[in-house]
Each structure stands twice: as structure tokens, then as C-alpha cells.
């Protein structure tokens, strides 16, 4: 019903974006979602709400680039809590000092930590999902292809943090 009314007022993509926000309203932080979309995109794209941010998140997106057409809810950060673990309210953290490249649907469940160092590139293709409490640390470049799912509490690093001096 809501989607039909919105589709009359707005084009289909914008109506779907707003409908997603209302569908998951218990888990979406509306202020962060609206602020982030209008900060990073022109108004016509921001109204599609390509980035949806859940409650209990700490996000610094830095540079973000879409390598695909912008659609509603392409990036879902912490909007799908896991009730089995900690009532699904573990803090999701994204600290991006580099560049994030998005190639399609990208979902992070609650508790995920993504840290991207200055000058580093973290790129994901279409249909990528990170499970609860997973970690990604990118110092140079991490590239993830299509149809990738990472289970709970997994880690991806492109460094071992052991530095060698001459």
C-alpha cells in the first residue's frame, strides 16, 4: 500500500528506497541514513536511499564510489540483527580513510568491523554479505567478487601487522 502511494508521487526507485526504510523501521537509524545519503549523493540519487544504516553503528564512510547503477538499499549496514547473539545489538563500525568501491548489493550484519587505511582501496562486487561480528582490515587493497558470503566471526586482512626493519 505504502509503496503504491509512493510510486505515484515518486519514480519507482525512490519509492522502493523509502519503502525499505519503513519496512525495517525497527532496525534503521533514520537520521544517520538520511544524513549519509544526502551528504554523499546528489538529491536525485539520495532520495533512492542507496545506503541504509542500522541502529548502534559508528560510521565514517570517507570516499565511496559506486561502480553500478544507484538503486534503493544497495548498501545495508547493520539493518539485519541476529537475535541469537547479544540480542542483535552489537555495534557495527566502518572507519574509512581510503576508498570503498561498491559494485552491487552489499550487506553487513550487526557487529561487523571494517577498517580501511588512508590510501587503501576496499572493493566489493554484487551480492556480498558479511556475517555477524566479522572483521575486515584493509591496508592496501582488498577486492571481493560476486556472490560472496562470509559467515559469523570471520576475518579478512591484507596485512599481518608485523613490520620488518633493515
Q: How should each PLM-predicted stretch be described?
A:
Residues 79-80, 161-166:
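Acidic/polar low-complexity surface segments
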Residues 1-157:
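Domain-scale signature associated with acetyltransferase and cell-envelope carbohydrate enzymes
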Amino acid at each position: 500500500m505504502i509503496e503504491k502511494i509512493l510510486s505515484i508521487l515518486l519514480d519507482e526507485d525512490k519509492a522502493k528506497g523509502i519503502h525499505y526504510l519503513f519496512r525495517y523501521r525497527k532496525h534503521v537509524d533514520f537520521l544517520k541514513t538520511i544524513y549519509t545519503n544526502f551528504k554523499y549523493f546528489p538529491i536525485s540519487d539520495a532520495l533512492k536511499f542507496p545506503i541504509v544504516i542500522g541502529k548502534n553503528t559508528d560510521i565514517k564512510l570517507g570516499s565511496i564510489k559506486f561502480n553500478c547503477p544507484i538503486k534503493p538499499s544497495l548498501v545495508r549496514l547493520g539493518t539485519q540483527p541476529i537475535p541469537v547473539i547479544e540480542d542483535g545489538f552489537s555495534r557495527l563500525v566502518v572507519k574509512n580513510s581510503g576508498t570503498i568501491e561498491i559494485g552491487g548489493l552489499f550487506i553487513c550484519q550487526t557487529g561487523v568491523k571494517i577498517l580501511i587505511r588512508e590510501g587503501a582501496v576496499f572493493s566489493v562486487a554484487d551480492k556480498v554479505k558479511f556475517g555477524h561480528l566479522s572483521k575486515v582490515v584493509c591496508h592496501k587493497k582488498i577486492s571481493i567478487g560476486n556472490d560472496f558470503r562470509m559467515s559469523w566471526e570471520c576475518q579478512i586482512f591484507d596485512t599481518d601487522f608485523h613490520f620488518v626493519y633493515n
